[in-house]
Every structure is written in C-alpha cells, then in structure tokens.
Amino acid sequence: MPDGTRLAARLWLPVTDHPVPALLEHHPGGLGDTTAVRDAQRHPWYAGHGYASLRVDARGHGSSEGNPADPASPAGTDDGLALLDWLTARPWSNGRAGAFGIGRGGTAALALAARAPEALAAVVAVCADDRTAPRRDLAGAPLAAAVHGGSAARLAAACRPPDPRYTGDDWRRLWLERLAAVDPGADDEGGPIDLRTVRAAVLAFGGWADPQAGTVLRLVEELGPDARGVLGPWPHQYPDQGLPPGPAIGFLQETLRWWDHWLRGADTGVLKEPALRSWMNESVPPAPSYANRPGRWIGDDGWPSPDVREVHYGLDDALRTAGTPSGERFVPVRSPQHTGIDAGALRPAGGAADLPPDQREEDGRSVCFDSVPLPEPEELLGGPALRLRVRCDGRHGQVAARLCDVAPDGSSTLVARGAAALAGGTGPVEVEVELAPVAHAFPAGHRIRLALSSAYWPWLWPVAETGGFEVDPGGSVLTLPVRHLAADAGSGPVTFDPPEHAPVPAELHPEPLVSHPERQVVHDVAAGEWRLQLARPAGATVHPDGLAEEEHVLEAYRIRADDPLGARARTDRTLRLERTDIGWDVTLQLRSEASCDAGHLTVHDHLRALEGGDVIFERHWRRRLPRS
C-alpha cells in the first residue's frame, strides 16, 4: 500500500496473450482459512472465463500487515483504490475492473464504487449494507444479539493470527501488534454510503432471510437504469451455496453475464432483464429450516414496482383483536420479558435452527390483530409499514411488531417484523414502525395477523419499566405492499442456470467429540428464568494446504419473565490453528459478556492468545454504553 503496509493476496490469471479485465474481492476473512473453499470455487472459475481475479485480505486481517481496518471504512476504501490502481496498471490488464464481495466485502465494493474511480465499471454486491440504518439499533430500540454476538464475532475475526506459511517468522510480531491495536469499542466503518456518487453498474444480490434485503431494493431504486437486483429465499450466503433456505442458482454464470457486458462490451442481455427479480415465497408450515422454500421467480421492471399498491388495514376494522371490552379505546400491551425467545437468528447463515419456529407461543405473549380468512390469495412484495397511536406511561418503552401468516389449523408463520423505541410520559403519540421487506403469498383461507409486544429478547435489550404501552386501534393502521395477482401475465419466465463452481481441493472434517444443539431454549420454572443457547456446529477442518482449524462458539442469553434488568448475554469463542509440519500451534480464547441497567449497557470482553499452550497476550476491555 502507499504507506508501505503489505496486504496478503492471491491472484488467478487466465492463460492468454490478450489484455484482460480484472476483478477485485477485498474482504476481512483470511484467504488461507476462513474463505479458502469459496475462494477456490469462484476465483479460478472467473480466471477460466478470461478474468484476472484478485482476492485480498483486508488490512490487519488474515495474513495482511497493519492494524485491523474494515475494508469499507475510509481507510479500507483507500486501500481498495490502491489495489484497483495496481490491478489496472499490470501489463496484462485492459484497464477495466469490477469489484465484488459478500457481507462486509460487498459493502466494501459499494464503498469503493462511491469514490467513483474511473477504472471501476461494474460491481456485484451480495448481502451488502448501504449503511442507511444504524448497526446497533432497530429504529432506536437497542439491539442485543446484534451488538453482543456480532461484536464478539468481529472482535474474534480481527484477532485471528497471520499464517506463518505466508508471513514467515514475522507472524508473531504481526499478531502481537494486531492484538495490541484491537479496540472492540471502535466503530471504523464510516457513515452511510453516498449512492449519488456511484458511477459503476451495480448488480445486487440478497436473500429474504437476510437482514440486508432492503439494501437491494434501495440500490435498484436509487442507482437508475444500470442497476439490477436479485432477491432469493436465501440466508446470509452466496446464492450458489445451496444452504437453506434454497433453491440455489448459478451465481457465477449470472455475474459473468454482468462482467462480460460492462467490462468487455459483450451483448449478454443483462439490461433486458427486469430491474428486480424476486423469489415469491409460498405459504408453508412454520419450521426452523427449509432445504428449499416453495415459491416462484417473478420480475418487476422497476422499484418501486408499478404492480405493487398499498392496501391499508385498520386495527379497528380490517384487523381486530379479541378480548377487548367494547367501551375501551386503548388496548394494553404488556409482554413478558422473554417474548422473542422464538425469534430465530438475527442473521441466518443456513443453520438447522436459524429460522423462527411456530409463532403461536409468541403470539400468546403479544396482542394480536387478525383479519378474516382471506377470500382470495394476497401477495406481498416490499416493506410493510405500521402507524400506531400509542400511550406509554413509563419513561421509555419499545414496540415489536410481527406480521404472521395464520393457517386454518392455527399455526403461525412469521413473515416480517420491525421495532421502534417509544418516548414515555407525553400522552398519545403516533409512531411509525417499518417492517423488513418481504415477498410472501398468503393463500385464500389464511388470516393476516399483526402481533404487537412490548419486549423482544434477545433481539432487543429490554427497557427498565415493565408497564408496556397502550395502543389505540382506531388511530392505527397496517399498510401492506400488495402485488397484483396478474402482474406476471404476458411476461416471460424468470430463470437461472444451476450452480457451477471450479473444482475445489478436498477438506477434511473429522467427527466432533462433543456437539451441542444449534438452538436450545430452557425454562427454569422455579426460578422463572428463560435461557437461550446458540451453538455453532463444533468440529475441526483440515484445509487443503495442511492448516488444521478448530473453532467452538457458544452464545447464551438469559432473562426472567418479570425482570428486564436481569437480562444477560455471554459469548465464548475458542479458535485453535495448527501446522504440524512446522510445529505451529496457536489458540485464541474470547469471552464477551453484556448486561444492562436503567440507563446503560455494560460490555466486558476478555481475550487470551496462546502459543503452544502458553499465554503470550491477555487483555480485558470494559465499556459502559448509554442506551441512547
């Protein structure tokens, strides 16, 4: 880099005498371990189709030098510009380049495009974040699982050691410098990405099961005619991985059409595709995982789509709640603190228990407003919106809203959700709650349910008061984005090829000695406490280059049904990396704990780094964060 820092990279080149375009993936995952398999699937495939493909570990991550920096931060984007300049200055380059990535790598590609470098002609962003919404709260309501589990994961990723196979004997010095520089409280990501300055053509992929689905809709809406979006049923994964919920598609073939059009000038028909291609989820019985979600592909020529209209459901008319005296104007909402225990994962990644199970128990802890059985099917595409007239007598409050599909047998499948903070003591006020965007087909005979609760643990930190709030149904309305049932008439089918990948060297996965359920709920009846335990499937991986990796992750959340300030969160992560041929054996241990009081959240992180069983670095961090 211009400051002398060296970044670890791997370059795949096509066998040709002609200049070729280049592709850049700039990501914080280590290319020798964390992303080794998926890198081997796609970068050689792109090279085999005539592209120079470069995979780079972000500064301070993997085997790169320097202090940890998010690749989409201002400093990380500076590195991205330097990498782009290096690529396009190679003698084999035709001067045109594209950038791609998933998650933080996809966000880095968007941030790079916002700098408008001349050589960057196209971007493919998967499950990316345009950073229009804060990462630590949901409409002002502080997130618990996101702040705690997500921050612990980011801290662990930043603390992974360099690999001596690529850095030589310097690995220990680089690791100790990295550990000394890590700050779990730092937020180096930067602000929202300014989409107005993006000149590259953007193809965005996302999944309805991923919290960043809204980014795809915003990119299609704001970037104009050279942007395209694809939203499938997927979790936070590449669309060709086949992880639930599927079905998977030929992501590499689809992106090759994009690269060929913008980097080679070939007529591949990509601009003839609908601006937005979406998977319309069919109604299914609730389950924590679906191998393939039933549904169909649909196409819309723009976003907002002319085929989507707003339909309003008043909470005292089209939707009604049971058990409220007819003379009462306000309906009390006072949920037990463990409401939300069946929320599912905040960011599903294809696990066996990632999705929310049957919502009937959650509905019983909430106030529900139901429609009559639908006389005909109703398909939603976009973000539902909720306007509530509420009264909150406490100092603070929060509302969690869930949209559910209720089958004739009473089973309740979660469709969308959202939340907002409430300011108390001001009398009746109007509150806007944006629910996550969805594509869902309600069948005839099913009911639409809006469930309101005053707690949603562990997604949201509980407020100190337990009084909840009151809602005025007559002043409240749910607005649904309803797509015309005949919108597909006369349109050609939306199709994708099946997945293709480059051949991948074999990894070894020895059977784990101990395993834990991926998601386990325990109710201690005598203590009145609810505990949620999340475990990543344990085990070891031996990578093709001989690196042995073993990681164990256990998250635990607990709360009492009547004690909001007793909420506790804890994550334990252990990572061991070993190269037996050179006698290299290191372990990283991280414990992160979080608690709350009426005005603050307290987070304690404890990190230990070991070499050959001996502790070579240990550090504690304690942060006290105001709830606001």
Question: What is the meaning of each model-derived region?
Answer:
Residues 1-17, 370, 374-376:
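N-terminal cap/lid segment of alpha/beta-hydrolase-fold proteins
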Residues 173-227, 231:
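Serine-hydrolase catalytic core
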Residues 230, 238-239, 244-610, 614-628:
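C-terminal, loop-rich substrate-recognition/catalytic regions characterized by aromatic stacking residues
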